[in-house]
Amino acid sequence: MKLFKNWSDVNNVKQRQLLLAYFRFILKQIVKSWLLWVTAGLVLFLLALVLLIIPAFTKQDPLFLWSHPVVQMSSLIIPFIALFATIITFQVFINGYYNGLEILLITRFFTRGRLFFARLAVLFIWITGTAFLSGLFVSLTATLGATSQTVTDLVLSVFFGVLLLSLLFSCVLIIIAQFLNRTQSMLLLLLGVSLASFTTVILAFSIKPPSENLRDNGYQPLNLSLISKSKSKSVENVFTIIDSSNVSDPRNKKKSIVKTNPQAIWDEYGESSFFQSQYYWNVGYWINSLFRLNSLSDYRNFDVNLYFLNTKLNFDREVDTDKMVDFVSFRDQRHLYFLSYSFFINTHNLPTQPLPRILTYDNNGAFLEKIVPSFDDIKLDPPRVKKVYKFFSDTIIQSFRDYEAEEKERQEKEEKEKAEKDNGNGQDSNKVNSVSTEPNNKNSSDADSKDNNDSSDSQGKDSSKSKPKFRPRLPQFFDRVSINYSKFSSSFNTQLKHIHQGLSTRDEAMEIFKDKVALFYALSMAYDNFTFQKDSGIIDNTSLNKFKTEFNKKQKELTEKNKQKQDGKDQKSQRMTQGADKAVTVEPKAMQSEIGMTDQTNDQSSSETKDSMDSSDSSDTVDNTDESEDKQSEEEEKFDEEIENAKKMPKAEDAFFNTASIWLSSPFLFFENGAKREQRYEIHLLNSNTQVNNEIIKTNSFYYVSGEPIVGQEVIIAMVLVVTLGLLVGSFFAYQKRDIK
C-alpha cells in the first residue's frame, strides 16, 4: 500500500482544503481540552518551582540544584512530561479510534498515511510550543544571578529535553496502545517512566559510591572548589585530594596498600564500584542527562564523595594552593536543603597565628533554614572592602584610645590607694619601733639577749627572702598596650548594622557575611602593606598608620616607665641587702659587750658555746645569701631573654590582626520571629574542624582534577534521536496495521 494514493490529488483544491480543514479541526480540539492545558501547566509549574521559586526563597543557586549528581531535579519533571505526552497523544491519535471519527476519515477522505502525518504535525507543533514556553520560563533564572553561559545551557537543555522526551513517550504510547486500552497504556507508560527516572536516586541509597569503596581500602577522598587569585568571576575546576589514612576495619587492615599515585588509586578502587558500571543499563540516567547538557553535565559537576555517572576522573597535575587560591571550599555536605561551606585561606599573604586559616559560613542546627552564599558572594568587592576596612580601622584606633584612657584612670587609682596604704603602714611601724626601744628589766636580760640574738639571725636569713623579685610582670607590662575587644566589637557591629538597616533579617545576615569576607581581603592587603610595603590601591592605611604610631608611642612610654621602676627596685634591693649585712655583723657584738658588763658571772664554757652557735648561724646566713643570688641571677637571665623576645614581636601588628581574628571568628547572631518558628541565622568565619583541615592542607597534595565523559553528550543526543525516529517508524507501521472497529 502506497503512502499516498493518487499523489496528484493533493494538488487538487478540494483535497487541500480537506487537509487544512482537518488540521484546523484537530488544533481546535486540542485547544478546547482543559486536561491538556492542566498537564502542560504542571510541567511549567514544576520547572518554575525548581528553578525559580525554591532558589528565590532559599537563596540557593538554581543551577546547583538542577545539576546535583544524586538529587536529579529533572527526575521530578520527567513523569509529568510523560503525562503531558500521554494526554496529547490520546487527543490526537487515540480518541478518534474509540469515537468512530477515524473510520469515517479513512473510508471517505484520507489514507492512513496522510492521516498519521497530519496528526503528527499537530502533535509536533503543540509539543514544540510547550518546550518553547518551558525554555522561556527557565530563562528567568538569569535574574537570580546565574551567568549567561549557564543559563543558555539550561534553556537549551530544558527545550531539547521536553521536545525529545515528549516525542519519545508519544511514539511508545502509540505502539503499546495497539495492544492495550487507554487506561492500561497510560498506567504502564507512567509507571515505567517514573521508575526509570528515579533509578539513579534509588540506587544511590542501596549501592556504595566510589568514595566508600576508596575508604574501605584505606583512602580518603576530599572534594574541593576554589576561587582563584585572578579575582575573575569564573570559578575554577574542582580540586581533589586523595589522602592515605588508617583503616579502622580489621578486615581491611589485612590489605597492604601502598600507593602514592592518586590516578592509580582511583582507577583501581573508585571505578570498580558497581554504581559506575550500572551506568550502561541505567535508562533513567540517559533520559535525565538530556536536561543537563554542556556546563550542567555530570563530568563538569562531579563530586568524588557522591555518586556520579558517565565521568572518568583525570588527576592532571599538582596544585600549589599558596600561590593559586584565595578560598578553597570544602563541600562537606551537598544535599538539597543542608549545605555547609568551609573556606581555606592561603598562608602566603596572611600571618599564620593572628588570623584563622579556615573560614566557614554555616547555620547551626540542621532543623533551621540555611543561608548558603553563592561563589559570587565571596568575590573581591573593592568598594565594600574599602568601606568595611575604613570602619574597622577607625573603630580600632578609637577603641585603643578608650582603653588607654581607662587604663590610665585605673593606674592612677591604684597608685593613690597604694600611697594611702603605705602611709598607714609607716605610722604603724613608728609606733612599734618606739615601744621596742624602751629599757628592759634587768632581771630578764638573759632572755632578752637570747631573743635579740635570734632576731638578728632571723633578720639575716630573711633579708634575702624579703628582696623583691627581679623580674616584673611582663604580661601586665605588654598587655596593657591593647584594645578593649568587647567595646570594639559592640561599636563595630553597631556601625555595620546601621549601614544595613531597613533590610530583612535574612538579607542583613547575608550582608554581614559579605562584610566579613570583604574584611578578610582588606586584612590580606593590610598585611602585605605591613610586611612587604605593598600598596594595594584599594584600602586607605591612614587610620592604621595612626594606630601604629600611637601604639608604638604608648609602648615606648611603658618601656621607659618600667625601666625606671626596675632601676628603683634594684637600688632599693641593694640598699636593703647592705643594711641587712651590716645588721648581721654589728648588732651581735654590741649586744655581747652590753651583756658582758651587766653579767660578769658567766663562765668561760658558756661563752665558748655561745660563740660556736653564733658562728654556725652566720655560716647559714651566708649559704642562704649565695642561694638567693643564684636565683636572682637566673631571674635576670629569664627577664633579659623575655625582653629580647618581646622586642622581636610586631606589637602593633599583633594587636591589630588579633582583634580582627577574634571578630572574624566570632559568631554574629540574628533572630527573626516567623509565623511558625523562630529563625536563627549565625554568621561566623571559623570551622570547628580547623585543626583537622589544617593538617590535611599541610600534609597532603592537591591536584587539578578534570572530568571526561565516558559517552559524549553528542552521542547521547544522537542515540535518543535514533531511538525516537525508530519508535516513530514503528508507531507508523503499528498505526497502519491497526484494526478499525
From Swiss-Prot:
GO cellular component term of the entry, any: plasma membrane
Location(s) in or outside the cell: Cell membrane
Keyword field: Cell membrane, Membrane, Transmembrane, Transmembrane helix
Principal location: membrane
Membrane topology: Multi-pass membrane protein
Compositional bias segments (type: Polar residues): 424-439
Region Disordered: start-end pairs: 404-473, 555-647
Name of the protein in question: Uncharacterized protein MPN_335
